[in-house]
Regions:
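N-terminal and secondary-structure boundary signal
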Residues: 1-103
Length: 103
């Protein structure tokens, strides 16, 4: 059985190494440049969460990944899934509105 590579970075930051920079280095080290993204649509599945909650990916992280993918010729877009339970994310229109409220 082949072993998988595991990539890790800690969450400690310094003035010269913030979390966005660490994420970018991690993605590059994992080999994102070895994938042919030229003119390909690339879905970035993220969790938008309900308005007022804090368990969603902050926009600056998604923006950094989008920038990296565009540099590689990709056509990235963000996506999420509606929920089965009732709430603001149970239909597409309200879901998009709650996403905008979270940034």
């Amino acid at each position: 059985m082949n072993t998988s590579k595991v990539y890790f970075t800690n969450l400690r930051t310094t003035p010269s190494s913030n979390l966005l920079d660490k994420m970018e280095r991690l993605v590059k080290r994992a080999g994102i440049a070895n994938i042919d993204f030229k003119n390909q649509f690339v879905a970035i599945k993220i969790h938008f969460d309900e308005p007022g909650n804090l368990a969603y990916i902050r926009p600056n992280y998604a923006a950094r990944l989008v920038s990296l993918l565009r540099e590689l010729g990709a056509k990235p877009f963000l996506t999420d899934c509606n929920t089965l339970y009732s709430g603001r994310r149970s239909n597409a229109v309200d879901h998009l509105q709650s996403d905008m409220e979270n940034g």
